[in-house]
């Protein structure tokens, strides 16, 4: 009897732990738009990957009228309506080339409380900081240790990666000032490796040198689906509640090629990046 009771309690504890977890990812889906969504094979794998997550930040969204985004949400909600919702930025970029930041999320797990664009200066004057300024989103997460947190997205311009990653420190301070919020996740394709950020340049990046920020994806990680071995994509967390909520060893790239047994050609057709993911308890 005692053995059965202990087993039942352990099972309940496991269920509660799973129920109270939140899986978050940042995924640069190369040139995500109508062409990619018109390919049934690529679409099926993209949907399969995104269904792993409660919140997913998608970058490199080339979709002027949100047509591809609409098709993606239709696929994500195919089995049950309103399984996923989305928040999309306006097209961002200094010249004719523009991208959106796209968040897809499960409304049964989190809700969007607010969002805003970080003001990084005068774009027409050429004095702005970011090629694609962060569109910051504030989430409520009632089932995790941290009940509210913000996500700051960044897909940096490779040639400006050092300056843009460093400027995320200023974005964090701005989020604190605007919302009085310490718990912030900064993530995306930072281009934080190779010749874009060299080992000697890390000391000039405040987001790296300030101990308030915890980098979850190490420099040794490979976040690319190509033959390169680079840690371009990162997740950084700040704030005591958010840092405490991170499940140990849960932050990593998700190698979908290995997980699904894909050829190099098919994997790279999906994207040249792997998602980077983390679980909150």
From Swiss-Prot:
Key word Calcium present: yes
Q: Which domain of life is it from?
A: Eukaryota
CDD domains named in the record? DNase1
One GO MF term, please?
actin binding
Q: Name where it's found.
A: Secreted; Zymogen granule; Nucleus envelope
Record field: catalytic activity: Endonucleolytic cleavage to 5'-phosphodinucleotide and 5'-phosphooligonucleotide end-products
> What's the record's note on cofactor binding?
Divalent metal cations. Prefers Ca(2+) or Mg(2+).
Q: Which PROSITE patterns has this protein been placed in?
A: DNASE_I_1
Q: In which tissues is it expressed?
A: Equivalent levels in pancreas and parotid gland, low amounts in kidney, liver, small intestine, stomach and thymus.
Q: List the disulfide bonds.
A: 122-125
Q: What class of enzyme is it?
A: hydrolase
> Signal peptide position in this chain?
1-21
Q: Which UniProt keywords apply?
A: Actin-binding, Apoptosis, Calcium, Cytoplasmic vesicle, Disulfide bond, Endonuclease, Glycoprotein, Hydrolase, Nuclease, Nucleus, Secreted, Signal
According to its UniProt record, which cofactors does this protein need?
Ca(2+); Mg(2+)
Glycosylation site residues: 39
Active-site residues are 99, 155
Identify the EC number(s): 3.1.21.1
Q: Can you cite a GO biological process for this protein?
A: regulation of acute inflammatory response
Q: Where is this site: Involved in actin-binding?
A: 34
Any one GO CC term of the record: nuclear envelope
- Family, per entry: Belongs to the DNase I family.
Q: PANTHER family in the record, alphabetically?
A: DEOXYRIBONUCLEASE, DEOXYRIBONUCLEASE-1
Function as written in the Swiss-Prot or TrEMBL entry: Serum endocuclease secreted into body fluids by a wide variety of exocrine and endocrine organs. Expressed by non-hematopoietic tissues and preferentially cleaves protein-free DNA. Among other functions, seems to be involved in cell death by apoptosis. Binds specifically to G-actin and blocks actin polymerization. Preferentially attacks double-stranded DNA and produces oligonucleotides with 5'-phospho and 3'-hydroxy termini. Together with DNASE1L3, plays a key role in degrading neutrophil extracellular traps (NETs).
What this protein is called in its record is: Deoxyribonuclease-1
Q: Which organism is it from?
A: Oryctolagus cuniculus (Rabbit)
